[in-house]
């Protein structure tokens, strides 16, 4: 028998907690015998004293086990259960292509995704731009669609990692969000409760990333790989660039449109293709569906080009309540804004930098994201046909197309983009994918 305040005192004094102490505290969080004040104090002691790797693993497992942990064994999928998670960015629509691509190669991807957070877009918000798409199916339907389509992307249910919900809500209002131990446990407790065999973590770097520096992103990636493997789930991470919008679009319906066009081979943004392929290839190698990265990439290009990946996406949409003919008639189903016109730079010159975070906030300001949890989303608004870093902005080459509801909204968005995209000065190229981090690299 432990006392929450004694566990807090021990951590406050810089000592390492045992797995039993951490389990006791997190069970108390889940059953409400630990108060919000105690959660806040616990989070702050971790913020100042950090956790050892065994403590991080114990915290992650305790939060994972605070609710239901899905067991897929009765489904007899007949292939590896794999998933990926991204720390989030702007125009990061990779999940919508990645799930079907891996499914078409023989993997099973039961993906539990989130909504937009701050400046980052949410996979669920994008999918809800598809009429009828149900992000909260029963567990039976979730499993059935995963089995039939190879992929199902849904929202977090209340019975997965409930302790994380309480801890996160308290961290959000006590300035303890940006701590590697707490971020690691929060991300992984939800993901590992979904019954995965392996996981690929896409950690973003740059002006639109969650972590402020390359070093912080690398530290988070290493923590996630070490903790997830320690908790029994094979995991690797990739560090990818978020110094500019990843896709050619940012918003909800505009990103779904780009994802469908990507899967059908109508248009594939080269950066989006590279980052998506990097994550998918890791998933195939981890799931033993490919010998190595080269083999994986060849298989992935094949399912993109022969239409099998697009077919898996269509099956998922139909299985979760969306239109059965969505892939053929997607443009008729996705909401469109009344005003779609370009914005130009105020001067001609090379695009040398993007404040990607500010571009994400411009989407939110238009109604394409939430300022508070109760806000509703306008699926039609956003941007597409983005200029890339290193390209020349001119009277012929706009910064982007703005999808707005009215002229005033268009003007506000135009001002935001002109301020966020720097024209002129030195442009230093950055790689799309910086590096992979595997267990043996730590």
UniProtKB/Swiss-Prot annotation:
GO MF annotation: an example: thymidine phosphorylase activity
Top class in the EC scheme: transferase
Organism superkingdom: Bacteria
Reactions catalysed according to its record: thymidine + phosphate = 2-deoxy-alpha-D-ribose 1-phosphate + thymine
SUPFAM superfamilies: Nucleoside phosphorylase/phosphoribosyltransferase catalytic domain, Nucleoside phosphorylase/phosphoribosyltransferase N-terminal domain, Pyrimidine nucleoside phosphorylase C-terminal domain
Pathways per UniProt: Pyrimidine metabolism; dTMP biosynthesis via salvage pathway; dTMP from thymine: step 1/2
E.C. designation(s): 2.4.2.4
Keywords: Glycosyltransferase, Transferase
UniProt GO cellular component terms: cytosol
The keyword Transferase is annotated on this UniProt entry: yes
Gene3D superfamilies linked to this entry: Nucleoside phosphorylase/phosphoribosyltransferase catalytic domain (3.40.1030.10), Pyrimidine nucleoside phosphorylase-like, C-terminal domain (3.90.1170.30), Transferase, Pyrimidine Nucleoside Phosphorylase, Chain C (1.20.970.10)
Signal sequence coordinates: none
UniProt record, GO biological process: pyrimidine nucleobase metabolic process; thymidine metabolic process
Matches recorded under Pfam families: Glycos_trans_3N, Glycos_transf_3, PYNP_C
UniProt similarity note: Belongs to the thymidine/pyrimidine-nucleoside phosphorylase family.
Description of how the protein assembles with itself and partners: Homodimer.
Role this protein plays: The enzymes which catalyze the reversible phosphorolysis of pyrimidine nucleosides are involved in the degradation of these compounds and in their utilization as carbon and energy sources, or in the rescue of pyrimidine bases for nucleotide synthesis.
Protein name listed in UniProt: Thymidine phosphorylase
Chain's gene name: deoA
